[in-house]
Amino acid sequence: MDVVKDFQRFAREDVYRFPIAKDVTGVNVMKAALVRLDDYERKNPRQFTDIINYSRATAYERLRDYNQALASYRKVAAMEGPLRAESLKNIETLEAFKAVLDQPIPTEDPFVYMKALDDRVDSWNELVKKHQGTRFEYLARVEEEKIDRAKVAFIEINRFRLTDGNHITILAFSQLVTKHRQSKNYYRYVLDFGDFYVRLAKDYVAENDPEGLAFDMKVFEQLAKSALGLYTEVASVDGIVEKIEAQGKIEALRGLNDKVRRLNR
């Protein structure tokens, strides 16, 4: 079946390190596969039902729609055939994924909220270890990464409520980019980290008039330098979509730096 053969080449790729591939038309291969599978099923009813449903489950799985993936795997598991045993194993794995996703996250207390996120990270890390070397390891890493990024966002939003919140946010970003250096989102995180330093620099300018005597140019320059280093790291890498964005941020930062210097003279 050509409809299955085309996307199976990508079904086991590392979705943590690499984005899902595009087909010749530029469409996500997993989304395209779902459309083609539906079309094939309409035109050829009751043919290769187990293969169609197993392939559909795999595509949903790659797209992290675990409910739809489970529904399709269960259809295959209800049939006698060579894909039944594998479907049963996949059902067990995805049910474990669902159990983690369904863990309650209390929102009333920020410290309880952070503890709940930490618990989820630990749960995903256990699944990463359990499924090491399989495609489920990659999915578990993606889910773990998602929670890690949410933790940083929460700290950043609430930094004014925390003692030394700016330093804590910098530490959180540092941990994120260190832990997920192999992620496809790594350069996105580096840019976000740079953006935070720019935000700190702008906050410093807003709180301390550059034309006044209280303004310390060295403090501003250190923040700008930290941002520039992060932006430059991204801008120096060829073949990534974030490169042009990083170059634009460097130019904007230079403009800000020049403006503040003129005011501070």
Residue spans of the language-model regions?
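Acidic, polar-rich low-complexity tracts and alpha-helical solenoid repeat scaffolds
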Residues: 1-265
